[in-house]
Regions:
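Bacterial N-terminal signal peptides that target proteins for export
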Residues: 2-21
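C-terminal motif of bacterial Sec signal peptides marking the signal peptidase cleavage site
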Residues: 27-32
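Bacterial signal peptide processing site
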Residues: 34-37
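Bilobed "Venus flytrap"/periplasmic-binding protein-like clamshell domains
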Residues: 47-77, 82, 142-212, 293-297
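An extracytoplasmic/periplasmic, membrane-proximal ligand-sensing/linker region
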Residues: 57, 184-187, 194, 267-311
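Paired acidic/hydrophobic, glycine-rich loop segments that form the ligand-binding mouth/hinge
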Residues: 98-102, 221-227
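Ligand-binding "clamshell"
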Residues: 111-138, 220-223, 232-245
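A bilobed periplasmic-binding-protein/Venus flytrap-type ligand-binding module shared by bacterial periplasmic
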Residues: 147-157, 250-263
Length: 311
């Protein structure tokens, strides 16, 4: 994968307009890889280009970096919602994008599918070691966007549940999730082999959506797999269990940087990462989905709350 990215980097490639986007789709074989905005490339040689995935939560993160940089005196251009990893990674590798919010575990698996690390710090260091030439990662945040095991707050208090291993004292214990979860490494077999926790399994085919949450709250199942940044986790009724043994691949928020980013800009970005905790990302996502706030408003509000530079 590193040689694939180097291929684009060595040609100093820039994508402009729909023709370039179609070329990327043809080269990497991505079905339906269109995006809501066309990537136009850098229009000012001095500007820092901040990009984002075609994913609302990622756009909020990108806007947060962009505003912090602008408030610190940098000229910033935004290229948001430009597609998924197969589309935007060549653009980052080419130098067309300077700052891009990513996720450690997912990006490590993309760059090195054979990687075996699962715990947060190990994943981060492994990722740093396989970044393509000309690219680096800034500091990782505590905030993550990854699979997580969740119980109701009431059940957590009743059984004193703080981490996954504590589930061994719960009986009966039924796990609910998409049918493929039953055979995932971190599914029932992983729970038993790593933590000694035996579970039944009930398929719920909504990818951790409202049906899954309802089944948990109604005690049809006692354990579910939700993304750790899901805004439903802000309702105070659910609890994410810690995973000290690294059963689930850690995937913390981490900015990918081009070599154009100077040390002062890196420091600005690292200050954002230092303040960005798990609850922060959940709350940002809640403001987007529940209050219909714009990414710009969410970023500005959060930066102000943390005492960081903002617009």
């Amino acid at each position: 994968m590193k040689s694939f990215l180097s291929f684009f980097h060595s040609r100093g490639r820039r994508r402009t307009g729909a023709i370039g986007a179609g070329l990327v789709c043809a080269l990497v074989g991505v079905a339906g890889c269109g995006s809501s905005e066309t990537f136009e490339g850098r229009t000012s040689g001095d500007a820092i280009v901040v990009g984002s995935q075609d994913y609302y939560s990622n756009e909020i993160l990108a806007e947060t970096y962009a505003q912090a940089l602008e408030a610190s005196g940098y000229t910033v251009e935004r290229e948001f919602r430009i597609g998924q990893r197969e589309v935007y990674m060549p653009e980052i590798a080419s130098g067309a994008i300077d700052v891009f919010p990513e996720y450690t575990g997912s990006l490590l698996q993309y760059l090195n599918p054979a990687a075996t690390q699962t715990q947060a710090d190990e994943v981060y260091h492994a990722l740093a070691s396989v970044m393509p030439d000309g690219l680096s990662v800034a500091d990782q945040a505590e905030a993550a966007d990854q699979d997580s095991y969740v119980v109701t707050q009431e059940m957590a208090e009743r059984y004193e549940l703080k981490e996954i291993g504590d589930l061994a004292r719960v009986n009966p214990l039924v796990l609910g999730g998409n049918s493929e979860l039953e055979t995932r490494p971190y599914g029932p077999k992983g729970l038993e082999s790593v933590y000694g926790v035996k579970v039944g399994f009930t398929p719920i085919e909504d990818s951790g959506g409202a049906l899954t949450v309802k089944a948990l709250e109604n005690n049809q199942v006692q354990l579910v797999d939700l993304y750790s940044s899901d805004p439903v986790l802000a309702n105070g009724k659910l609890k994410v269990l810690n995973d000290p043994k690294g059963l689930i691949l850690a995937s913390r928020v981490v900015p990918v940087l081009s070599q154009r980013i100077d040390s002062r800009a890196r420091d600005v970005i690292n200050r954002v990462s230092k303040e960005l905790g798990p609850r922060d990302l959940v709350e940002m996502n809640r403001r987007s989905t529940t209050e219909a706030m714009s990414a710009s408003a969410i970023a500005s509000q959060w930066l102000e709350e943390k005492g960081l530079p903002h617009k």
